[in-house]
A protein has these predicted regions:
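N-terminal Rossmann-like FAD-binding beta1-loop-alpha1 element of flavoenzymes
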Residues: 4-27
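N-terminal FAD cofactor-binding segment of flavoenzymes
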Residues: 19-25, 29-81, 375-379, 383
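A glycine-rich dinucleotide-binding beta-alpha-beta segment and adjacent secondary-structure elements
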Residues: 278-344, 351-353, 371-388, 393-399, ...
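Predominantly flavin-linked oxidoreductase catalytic cores and closely associated redox partners
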Residues: 112-267, 276-287, 291
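Helical element adjacent to the flavin cofactor pocket in flavoenzyme catalytic cores
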Residues: 98-117
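Redox-cofactor binding/interface segments in oxidoreductases and associated redox assembly factors
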Residues: 7, 138-141, 337
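C-terminal auxiliary extensions adjacent to catalytic cores
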Residues: 393-440
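Internal hydrophobic alpha-helix adjacent to the cofactor/substrate pocket in enzyme cavities
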Residues: 351-371
Length: 440
């Protein structure tokens, strides 16, 4: 029986393990969280932990995230099925209860007889991985906090960016008389809790934010952020109105017939709505400063923090220089790299990466090469970005600029067309794979 060892039980590692095992491949799945768990980053012992937001992004049928999820669903993504089972109300977005999601994934892994789960193990290098866990092929899916030794054994030319996390507060400390339930433009159900700010309240918040005590970055490193992970104070430093035109934009909301100057949204962390994530409020402020600054928001004066915001350094490899078309290493072709370590950014992108890597391995075991998905698909776009050198490689996520589908339709119609046509072409590609797609 063919055997694959997967280092890392995050989104990519779990998806790859389930895809391979469903097709008769013996899998050893090794948890690989850092030996010293950072409580500000990791909170769970289980697999597939969602570290940052609890949202898998929009389910609107004119968005790149919808298209990528649709493609993964066509290919039978196990983790998106788990997400549906753990879903919480979040307007047009697919958001999950983190703990329920992890338990759902753990149940899928436990139910699959072809998967052997290994306890949390620190692996120092690729040679260490091969010696301790021999297999036909290996997948490294250790995520953005990969150990320095393992990272160095992959390549000396690795990149990084900083990722910021937003705080989570308890519902018990919120003054609901000052907040209101609504979704922007009244789309769907009123699933978000909203905190409206008048101009004076907004200015006071920005003043405190800019003056707050913040954690320093690592010595001799220039702070580089992926746009969606930028700390709120960094945005405010770019201009006092940046937040009111960004994460705090008030468009689509009215309070007593008037649009507020700014609106802070809170997204439920679970079905009971006992905890809320402060949307867009990722931060590197010290804990005491977070209490002081966020309690200036109307309705949050007595907020109880269940998790403080934080910043951590994410490492990723220079994929265009290091990876082959199947997402295996050019210098170590029996080793594949999946998930955020490979250079994709986002939950859905990590799930896709694990799924695609599994398909590439299945094709290889069958003596074939996996044909690339069509250029109009998000899968094809992500793959091309991971393979095409274009100056300094930056993490890639699902967006319309990575697909090839020209049309002269109006903007809204064009997006709908791109998504529908990309999903159609992916379906045709998928059904043409024949044996690779067949689960036992």
């Amino acid at each position: 029986m063919r055997r694959v060892t997967i280092l890392g039980a995050g989104l990519a590692g779990c998806e790859a393990a389930l895809q391979l095992a469903a097709r008769g491949i013996a899998v050893t799945l090794i948890e690989a969280k850092p030996e010293k768990i950072e409580p500000a980053v990791y909170r769970q012992d289980g697999p597939a932990e969602l570290v940052c937001s609890n949202s898998l992004k929009s389910e609107s049928n004119a968005t790149p995230s919808y298209q990528l999820k649709a493609e993964c669903r066509i290919a039978g993504s196990f983790l998106l099925g788990a997400a549906e089972a753990a879903k919480v109300a979040a307007g047009e977005s697919l958001a999950v209860d983190r703990d329920t999601f992890s338990r759902e994934v753990a149940a899928l892994l436990a139910a699959e007889r072809g998967i052997t789960l290994a306890a949390n193990t620190v692996v120092g290098s690729l040679d260490d991985l091969r010696e301790r866990f021999p297999a036909d092929l290996h997948i490294v899916a250790t995520g953005p906090l990969t150990s320095p030794g393992l990272l160095a054994s992959l390549s000396a030319d690795n990149h990084y960016f900083y990722d910021a996390i937003a705080p989570i507060v308890s519902a018990e400390g919120l003054d609901m008389t000052r907040l209101f339930w609504a979704d922007r433009y009244e789309k769907g159900q009123p699933d978000f809790l909203n905190c409206p700010l008048a101009r004076q309240e907004y200015e006071r918040f920005v003043d405190a934010l800019l003056a707050a005590d913040k954690l320093p970055y690592a010595d001799h490193e220039r702070p580089q952020f992926f746009d969606r992970c930028m700390p709120i104070e960094t945005m405010a430093e770019r201009g006092r109105d940046t937040l009111s035109f960004g994460p705090f934009r008030p468009v689509g909301f009215e309070v007593e017939g008037k649009r507020p100057y700014a609106v802070v949204q809170l997204r439920a962390e679970n079905a009971e709505k006992s905890a809320f994530n402060l949307v867009g409020c990722q931060t590197r402020m010290r804990h005491h400063a977070q209490r002081e600054v966020f309690r200036l928001l109307p309705g949050l004066e007595n907020a109880e923090f269940l998790r403080f915001g934080s910043v951590h350094r994410n490492a990723y490899i220079n994929a265009p220089e290091l990876l082959a078309d199947g997402l295996n290493l050019l210098k170590h072709p029996d080793t594949y790299v999946a998930g955020q370590l490979s250079g994709v950014e986002g939950y859905n992108e990590s799930i896709w990466s694990g799924l695609y890597t599994a398909l590439a391995i299945l094709a290889r075991f069958d003596g074939k090469e996996l044909p690339p998905p069509p250029a109009a698909t998000m899968s094809g776009g992500l793959l091309r970005k991971l393979r095409a050198p274009a100056g300094r490689f930056a993490p890639v996520n699902a967006n319309f600029s990575i697909i090839d589908n020209p049309t002269r339709l109006r903007k809204r119609d064009r997006k709908l067309f791109h998504v529908a046509d990309g999903i159609r072409q992916f379906g045709e590609w998928w059904h043409g794979l024949e044996k690779v797609t067949q689960a036992t």
